[in-house]
Amino acid sequence: MKKLTLLLVIILAGLMAFAQDVKTYQYVQRDTLELKLDFYTPSQVTDSTICVVYIFGGGFIMGNRDGEFEKAYFKQLVDEGFQVAAIDYRLGLKGVKNLSITNSQPLEDAIYMATEDAISAIAFLLEHSKELKVNKDYIVMVGSSAGAITSLQTDYALCNGFLNSNILPADFRLAGVVSYAGAIYSREGKVKYRNHEPAPTMFYHGTADKLVPYKQIKFFKIGFFGADALVKRFEKFGYPYYARRFEGYGHSVAAGGPVTVDDLVWFCRHYVLKKEHLQVDGFYRNLDPRTMPAFDMYTPGDLYK
């Protein structure tokens, strides 16, 4: 019993020490809404420290930047030497019902709002880079589900001059994007990166995802393009990527961050720091979908009703 008590004290002390390393900032105000970010710092920061901008998931209807799941993940990242900026963003699908390909305007609006907020958060980090010791050349976006959509969409906007991307320096480039079950929304048909190539991107996606398409959904030129469709574009144009496809899995892959930290470290070492131009693709078929939680097979109808 004494050993267990001591262990709990050690764990609690560790979490308290971790909490003391976070500072909260308001990065932008939208009307009366104050959007904030929590900034976590490792014990040592160097010129090669990577800053992860994390975008939480929740279908653009729920979620927050400082949930227990998120904070545990951030501790893993900080322990690996990453800075973490966990941001708020506007949840544009709250109250929306009957979302579909023929009723996609609410989704478009929500994605664009979240993307504008993410770009504003990056602008804040750049403006305060000296104070926060952020290297502007090593900013990597990581997102889950709606956050993954936002992360991919942010890089898409920066590469094409969309939305409020002009608030960032013209030479700014994301160092990487990591998407856990994300997609890109386009009104122009297939995804195109016109002004410069996209950041090296790590894709995680379940092949049976019914909430965010693994392949694509198209209605004339309006489309929602998941990992499979995006990898084909990256492959065609020679863009660097790292894809992990989970055969038979649905949307639960969105929660894969904490169990893939080693992958993230490898990706950042090779794609971000060493700038290796790699294209890595892998299927994972020896997995049992029956072990997945109920939300693994969620559809839009389960969230927007």
What are these regions (language model features)?
Residues 65-87, 94:
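Short amphipathic alpha-helix adjacent to the substrate-entry channel of hydrolases
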Residues 19-48:
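N-terminal cap/lid segment of alpha/beta-hydrolase-fold proteins
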Residues 232-305:
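C-terminal catalytic histidine-bearing segment of alpha/beta-hydrolase fold enzymes
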